[in-house]
Structure formats: structure tokens, C-alpha cells
Amino acid sequence: KACPEATKRTDCFHDLARFKRVYKVELSEANVGGPLRKIGYIDLMNIADPNKLARKPLDNGVLTFPFFTIENVDMVDARHIVVGNDNNLPFSSSRDPNKADDNELMLLEVGDFLKAR
């Protein structure tokens, strides 16, 4: 829920998350002590949901994961990862400015991402 530009109110967010990504990086002997090589990323602010599986409302047709922190990213199998957010703080709100967030887990099918080298 974005506030109209240049306004601050209690029923909307004036500073929305714009950048949330899960990166796959190369960890090898070749880059020890140097920069990591980015292999790919998943944009958590633009998650396609063509089968309408999300239990949270879509934003312009996509699921967003706007939380301040991402608590975990785990590989489930060769095609899936789970991304989780533990919203255990009573004043944590990223979806509705006047309501504490639920804990959320997303199971994402990202086989090509996981296979990328």
C-alpha cells in the first residue's frame, strides 16, 4: 500500500521496498579472496504467479516479498527453494501499515536458476 507521492500517512507506506533479491554466486578456488561472481538472481519484488497459488494479495499481477529482512533461503530439491520471513516482532509491518505481519514461507520453482553455472 503505497502512499500518494510526497505524503506521509498512517494508512499507507511512504517508503516502499524496491529491491529484494536472492542471488546465486560462485564459490570456488578461483575467487578465494576476491569478488564473487554473480550467476543469477530471483527478484523477490516481482514473483510471477500464473497459477494464482499465492495466499497474499498480488500487486499489479505479481507477488511481492517486501519485508525488511529475509530470514532464510534453503534449497528443497533440484527445482525448488523456500524463502522465509519470520515476522515475530509485534510492530513488524510490510503488507499493511496497521497490522503485524504473518510469518511467510514461499516455495519457488526455480530449476533453471539452480542449474545455472
What do the PLM-derived regions correspond to, one by one?
Residues 1-117:
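Sequence/structural signature of beta-propeller domains
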